[in-house]
């Protein structure tokens, strides 16, 4: 709040130094809405949206390399329709659809578990994609990157979100 008058007997102290960065004003508003929508506490959503350790500044964005065209280019068509459901074989690792999402720009890729998220993040990095693995690489996400993680990764900062992929948490593996 701006120009707040303190209660009598309370003296405000000037803010001398800002120690780090945190969630954007938009994420703060979203946390309030989510708390109202699911009758939860705002603090739970703010924890999900905040870095685990202090972050002095967002990481500098790496220059974007072209994302290679994978063998499953059929996934590119799914993103032409806005919202789509794509069915794949149970043993599919999700890399094809993830690469298709990354060809659109920075993507949010949600997986069922952290092991699968790590595996997918490594595969995307090998393909030349700038990846932030949630929740550990909050500063990288804030600087602009594809975010890979479990459902809580949806609270990571994404300044240039271009596509979202949810890899079914009810997968057959």
How would you describe each model-predicted region?
Residues 1-173:
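Accessory, non-ATPase domains that flank or precede helicase/AAA+ motor cores in DNA-metabolism machines
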């Amino acid at each position: 709040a701006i120009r707040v008058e303190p209660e009598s007997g309370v003296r405000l102290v000037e803010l001398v130094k800002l120690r780090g960065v945190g969630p954007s004003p938009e994420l703060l508003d979203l946390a309030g809405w989510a708390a109202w929508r699911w009758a939860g506490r705002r603090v739970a959503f703010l924890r999900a949206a905040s870095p685990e350790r202090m972050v002095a500044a967002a990481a500098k964005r790496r220059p974007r390399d072209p994302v290679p065209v994978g063998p499953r280019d059929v996934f590119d068509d799914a993103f032409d329709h806005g919202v789509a459901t794509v069915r794949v074989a149970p043993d599919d690792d999700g890399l094809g659809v993830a690469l298709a999402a990354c060809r659109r720009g920075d993507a949010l890729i949600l997986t069922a578990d952290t092991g699968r998220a790590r595996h997918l993040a490594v595969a995307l990095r090998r393909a030349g994609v700038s990846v932030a693995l949630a929740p550990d690489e909050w500063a990288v996400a804030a600087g602009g990157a594809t975010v890979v993680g479990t459902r809580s990764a949806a609270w990571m900062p994404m300044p240039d979100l271009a596509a979202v992929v949810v890899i079914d948490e009810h997968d057959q593996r």
